[in-house]
Amino acid sequence: MTNXRNEXXLLKIINHSFIDLPTPSNISSWWNFGSLLGICLMIQILTGLFLAMHYTSDTATAFSSVTHICRDVNYGWLIRYLHANGASMFFICLFLHVGRGIYYGSFMLHETWNIGIVLFLTVMATAFVGYVLPWGQMSFWGATVITNLLSAIPYIGPTLVEWIWGGFSVDKATLTRFFAFHFILPFIITALVLVHLLFLHETGSNNPSGLNSDSDKIPFHPYYTIKDLLGVFILLMVLMFLVLFFPDILGDPDNYTPANPLNTPAHIKPEWYFLFAYAILRSIPNKLGGVLALILSILILAAFPLLNSSKQQGLVFRPITQILYWFLVANLVILTWIGGQPVEYPFTIIGQIASISYFSIIVILXPMASTIENNIMKIYQ
């Protein structure tokens, strides 16, 4: 008798994705972040739905409605801070997930990797429009500064900015449309996640050794469901610790002041997870150049499969590239720190050095290291 989960069409899809899925037997905890991102997305959609029930997307009442959620709605403060800190957890998992993909050479699964880049950009767009919604000082000025970057596009730039604003400045029309975008984008992300998984299950997962694992596969359930469950509990513990003890540690104090177009904050900066890209943007004195560098800082991920010339998948047996990888990680930490600092000496020069080294490591040094490692391997073959 065939198992019930192999008969019904919908159950068969679930079965082949999460139960009987053949999985490499040696994947480490670095492979947990995919499922954690799924949990983060679910938390964000659920908390966001409950917030949307009480939020009003009008410049006159947006700030007050967020205050009302925190003060008057049952557990509104909990939902609001789960949503705000859930976004931070989302990006922590996202950075670790991408970092693992680079370290273990998962970018060689081209379709999965490219859909992943589209997902990354969509999540960044969602987080940006979401940050505008509380209509605090940093929300307003962040929206003004970032949308204004589009004016650097030759010829159509200024018209495009006014079209996005829905007027001649960030105002009621902007807030309403940003709320609409923020509501719809998570569902687009969910659809993209399904496509991401579809392409992943076409090829099967990569593994730490970088070797073909077809001869050594185990079913996803119960082995990896239990393993993922442990990751979920750790994620929820960290998230609840943040929410209950330090809910505002990752936020900006300026956002507790209602938006005022007549008063500019001393230092306009985005949320911490955008600071690395913001630092790259600020390190170039030219406006259009800065915008291009900002876009390239993310799109450069698409160059990894093209620049890869190594005979091995992953960095496990590649000591030179490993050193470069950790240089890149340290570089991103420095960029994140610089993005939050004022535009003055010595921060500007540090930001410029870090920006140049970010692109140099990926485009010049890593391919050179791969060539050296290939030649060393030839000697010892």
Curated annotation (Swiss-Prot):
GO annotations of cellular component type: mitochondrial inner membrane; respiratory chain complex III
Chain sites annotated for binding heme b b562: 83, 182
A molecular-function term among this protein's GO annotations: ubiquinol-cytochrome-c reductase activity
Subcellular location: Mitochondrion inner membrane
Name of the protein: Cytochrome b
Cofactor descriptive note: Binds 2 heme b groups non-covalently.
Binding sites annotated in the UniProt record for a ubiquinone: 201
Presence of the UniProt keyword Cell division in the record: no
Organism listed in the record: Sigmodon hispidus
Function: Component of the ubiquinol-cytochrome c reductase complex (complex III or cytochrome b-c1 complex) that is part of the mitochondrial respiratory chain. The b-c1 complex mediates electron transfer from ubiquinol to cytochrome c. Contributes to the generation of a proton gradient across the mitochondrial membrane that is then used for ATP synthesis.
Family: Belongs to the cytochrome b family.
Keyword Heme attached: yes
Domain of life of the native organism: Eukaryota
Residue numbers binding heme b b566: 97, 196
Gene3D superfamilies referenced in this protein's UniProt entry, alphabetically: Cytochrome Bc1 Complex, Chain C (1.20.810.10)
Membrane protein topology class: Multi-pass membrane protein
Quaternary structure and partners: The cytochrome bc1 complex contains 11 subunits: 3 respiratory subunits (MT-CYB, CYC1 and UQCRFS1), 2 core proteins (UQCRC1 and UQCRC2) and 6 low-molecular weight proteins (UQCRH/QCR6, UQCRB/QCR7, UQCRQ/QCR8, UQCR10/QCR9, UQCR11/QCR10 and a cleavage product of UQCRFS1). This cytochrome bc1 complex then forms a dimer.
Miscellaneous field: Heme 1 (or BL or b562) is low-potential and absorbs at about 562 nm, and heme 2 (or BH or b566) is high-potential and absorbs at about 566 nm.
Pfam families listed in its UniProt record: Cytochrom_B_C, Cytochrome_B
Keywords from the named record: Electron transport, Heme, Iron, Membrane, Metal-binding, Mitochondrion, Mitochondrion inner membrane, Respiratory chain, Transmembrane, Transmembrane helix, Transport, Ubiquinone
PROSITE patterns to which the protein is assigned, alphabetical: CYTB_CTER (PS51003), CYTB_NTER (PS51002)
